[in-house]
């Protein structure tokens, strides 16, 4: 089964590049490498990371942590999806 983990955060205004770099570094430093990963950006300094895993939906998988509170405007949003 294939599982996708999504992680989305919004940087403090003007710090989107810093959040993007932070997310890229943390994705590459995960304890176990995902099958695939993508890092995307959007207006309002938002960053989205999607990782794909060959695992059960409820598997214990490594996830990106919360960034420092001074880098983001709110708590990270997280979603987990399975292949339909």
List the predicted regions and their residue ranges.
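Signature tryptophan residues that serve as conserved aromatic anchors
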Residues: 7, 52-53
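Glycine-rich beta-strand-turn "strand-cap" elements at beta-sheet edges
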Residues: 1, 35-48, 64-84
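Short amphipathic alpha-helical segments
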Residues: 11-36, 64-67
């Amino acid at each position: 089964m294939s599982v996708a983990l999504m992680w989305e955060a919004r940087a403090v205004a003007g710090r989107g590049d810093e959040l993007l770099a932070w997310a890229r570094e943390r994705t590459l430093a995960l304890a176990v490498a995902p099958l695939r990963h993508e890092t995307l950006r959007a207006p309002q300094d938002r960053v989205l990371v999607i990782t794909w895993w060959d695992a059960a939906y409820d598997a214990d998988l490594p996830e990106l942590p919360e960034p420092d509170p001074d880098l983001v405007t709110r708590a990270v949003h997280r979603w987990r999806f399975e292949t339909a």
